[in-house]
Amino acid sequence: MHEMSLAEGVLQLVEDTARRESASRVKLVVLEIGRLSSVEPEAIKFCFEAVTHGSIAQGAALEIIAVPGAGWCMQCAETVPMTELYGACPTCGSHQVQPTGGTEMRVKEIEIE
């Protein structure tokens, strides 16, 4: 489960930000997770709750925004929606599709007090 190490990385970033801003606690963390990122939202929620126990982020709400997948089809020469990382182009069926979006995970927002 790689979500545990991802949650630990998010916590480190959140703690660093809270420390830099002299915050007393973290109220909310908003993550953007791409549909093609191989990150399971429910698993990251579970892991986030586990790793934040006893930290400045304990009890913080975790909001996840799903980012749709997109890719460049070399056959169609256009951007197409993608639901699978190595899926076929929904327009022409070609597998020559280069992902251009939805593969990332990033911290979009941190709300602190």
Swiss-Prot record:
<comment type="function">
    <text>Involved in the maturation of [NiFe] hydrogenases. Required for nickel insertion into the metal center of the hydrogenase.</text>
</comment>
<feature type="binding site">
    <location>
        <position position="2"/>
    </location>
    <ligand>
        <name>Ni(2+)</name>
    </ligand>
</feature>
<comment type="similarity">
    <text>Belongs to the HypA/HybF family.</text>
</comment>
<dbReference type="GO" id="GO:0036211">
    <property type="term" value="P:protein modification process"/>
</dbReference>
<dbReference type="GO" id="GO:0051604">
    <property type="term" value="P:protein maturation"/>
</dbReference>
<dbReference type="Pfam" id="PF01155">
    <property type="entry name" value="HypA"/>
</dbReference>
<keyword id="KW-0533">Nickel</keyword>
<feature type="binding site">
    <location>
        <position position="92"/>
    </location>
    <ligand>
        <name>Zn(2+)</name>
    </ligand>
</feature>
<dbReference type="InterPro" id="IPR020538">
    <property type="entry name" value="Hydgase_Ni_incorp_HypA/HybF_CS"/>
</dbReference>
<feature type="binding site">
    <location>
        <position position="76"/>
    </location>
    <ligand>
        <name>Zn(2+)</name>
    </ligand>
</feature>
<dbReference type="GO" id="GO:0016151">
    <property type="term" value="F:nickel cation binding"/>
</dbReference>
<protein>
    <recommendedName>
        <fullName>Hydrogenase maturation factor HypA</fullName>
    </recommendedName>
</protein>
<keyword id="KW-0862">Zinc</keyword>
<feature type="binding site">
    <location>
        <position position="89"/>
    </location>
    <ligand>
        <name>Zn(2+)</name>
    </ligand>
</feature>
<dbReference type="GO" id="GO:0008270">
    <property type="term" value="F:zinc ion binding"/>
</dbReference>
<keyword id="KW-0479">Metal-binding</keyword>
<dbReference type="InterPro" id="IPR000688">
    <property type="entry name" value="HypA/HybF"/>
</dbReference>
<feature type="binding site">
    <location>
        <position position="73"/>
    </location>
    <ligand>
        <name>Zn(2+)</name>
    </ligand>
</feature>
